[in-house]
Amino acid sequence: MTRPSVKLLTTLLACLMEMLNFRVSSGKDPDLLSSSSSSMSPSDFLDKLMGRTSGYDARIRPNFKGPPVNVTCNIFINSFGSVTETTMDYRVNIFLRQKWNDPRLAYSEYPDSSLDLDPSMLDSIWKPDLFFANEKGANFHDVTTDNKLLRIFKDGTVLYSIRLTLILSCPMDLKNFPMDVQTCTMQLESFGYTMNDLIFEWLDKGPVQVADGLTLPQFLIRDEKDLGYCTKHYNTGKFTCIEVKFHLERQMGYYLIQMYIPSLLIVILSWVSFWINMDAAPARVALGITTVLTMTTQSSGSRASLPKVSYVKAIDIWMAVCLLFVFAALLEYAGVNFVSRQQKEFLRLKRRQRRTQKEEDLQDGRLHFSSYNTTTCVKDGAVVKNTQVNQIQQPSILKNTETNRKKFVDRAKRIDTISRAAFPLAFLIFNVFYWITYKIIRHESARKD
């Protein structure tokens, strides 16, 4: 072999080796990639990806000085706890999931399409500074270990999931209580990064998921949930914010059993006095006072679990009207008693008039004696017999007295008779207007809103 041929062969062999080295270093050859990855341990790979020797800095956001980082969020609701009217808040247990792309974490030297890392690695990477704007209290879960998930994909996409229990503020409008529909909001906001650096968005598919069979004691969670943006403007800048609104429809079965039906029965019980004899004053008065006091206690109990708001609620109107009907039934007997006693007052007035007339006759010197059909009159010291005088006959007095007594008693009985029909009819009319207004008109209006 000639010298030029050997030189040419050597040059070709060197070029081939250079090409092979380039393909190995660039990771484009699958076979060489497999052999290289098998020789690299996971610990070495993680150190190379985000360790001290990688040059990765968790203090700097992805695309620094470039476009903002888009973070897609979705939540999974494990449980929806108690909704408290007095403090106007609600408790919820969720999985919060955030996903964003960090080009510095993209890899090709490892065969797996994604890496599930220990939660302790969260301190080694950059994370969004998300917080809940309407949060009143929160806590993490660490039984039996930290309930956190970190997953990194080949293209640098990072999935961060965490389990939280939150107490969130929920301003309530209780005008239609207990037939109200409440709208409770959850707001996710960036604390320090403005919209030039960070933007939150809802996941396109299934942004808010609810566990199967999730129920609340007093509320029904509607299927529709309003998703939107709630961008906040402060003196320090414009901050990204997304929100979800939960529509909670109150189930009034508890209040129907504990408040409406007992108060209804108390009102009906107060009407029993209309069938009791008006002469049985102790029985009717005791029944009236008992129902009034019971209704007052019931009304106070209905407000014990509610905040001291300045407006009138639906339950307040119901309790006030029931108390009014019970008190009116007690006043009705007072009126009946007063009318029935007018006959005694009338007789007392007649006796007073006759006594006054006799006194006037004595002062005028006239005195009448009636005996054995002979009338004797003493006038000016002289006795005059057979004087014609208008005498009040005793049978006539008794007859007039009985007539007057019967007239007043009939009036009192008529009041009781009218009340037996008027009170139930008035209460029925009130119920028709009350339930149509609150259960149909206002309730449907709240559902549409």
UniProtKB/Swiss-Prot annotation:
Residues 1-27 form the signal peptide. It is a multi-pass membrane protein. Its main location: membrane. Disruption phenotype: GLRA2 morpholino knockdown leads to axon hyperbranching of spinal motor neurons at 24 hpf. Keywords: Cell membrane, Cell projection, Chloride, Chloride channel, Disulfide bond, Glycoprotein, Ion channel, Ion transport, Ligand-gated ion channel, Membrane, Metal-binding, Postsynaptic cell membrane, Receptor, Signal, Synapse, Transmembrane, Transmembrane helix, Transport, Zinc. NCBIfam families: LIC. Belongs to the ligand-gated ion channel (TC 1.A.9) family. This is Glycine receptor subunit alpha-2.
